Amino acid sequence: MSRTSLIKLIHVARRELQLDDDTYRAFLMQKTGKISCRELTVTQLEQVLGAMKERGFKKQNKYPRRRFKGHVTPREKVYKIWQQMAEDGFITDGGDVALDKYVQRLTAKRNGGQGVSTLAWCHGDTLLTVLETLKQWHIRCIREAFSRHGLPLPVSPSGRELRGYDAMTAAYAHARKTRRMAQ
């Protein structure tokens, strides 16, 4: 690590360890015999940083490592939502045949009576329509479940009612996990 980077990191550590100027300079004097980072060699700077780490400083990455979630296709999302709805008890059959029948009924309305026979054949706008319609149905089921159990609909920290799919499903999962809602 370069000398400048070490000095910057030592100053970050000083802030995190909440060392006032006198304590910081006494600490440097004790470890190196000098009272300023400017006077220290790279080896001495590394020793000071090591001593600060022993006192509890933890270097944090500038860019925290994020877990790769991968790309999830809309078709995979439809399957997952369908399975989740079955697991939640909103639909009785979470299988592929039942999903294909749902897709056929839904797409028949758009195609003048002739629906797409299976989800695997849906592409583009048709697939997105199936996905968004299924999400809205799931949200309606969740709202009904909250109402049925006498629970208030979830709200954001600002007090506004949650409407987004991810927020609603997370609130429902939390309510089930905390046993506020029967499984």
From Swiss-Prot:
InterPro entries: Phage_Mu_Gp16. It is found in: Host cytoplasm. GO terms for cellular component: host cell cytoplasm. Induction: This protein is constitively expressed from the Pgem promoter unlike most other early proteins which are expressed under the control of the Pe promoter. Its expression seems to escape repression by repressor protein c and thus occurs throughout latency. It comes from the Viruses. The keyword Transferase does not apply. Keywords: Early protein, Host cytoplasm, Host-virus interaction, Modulation of host cell cycle by virus. Its main location: host cell. GO terms for biological process: symbiont-mediated perturbation of host cell cycle progression. Early protein responsible for decreasing host DNA gyrase activity. Promotes DNA relaxation of bacterial host genome. Modulates the expression of various host genes probably controlled by supercoiling of their promoters. Host genes affected include DNA replication and cell division determinants. Belongs to the mulikevirus gemA protein family. Homodimer. This is GemA protein. It comes from Escherichia phage Mu (Bacteriophage Mu).
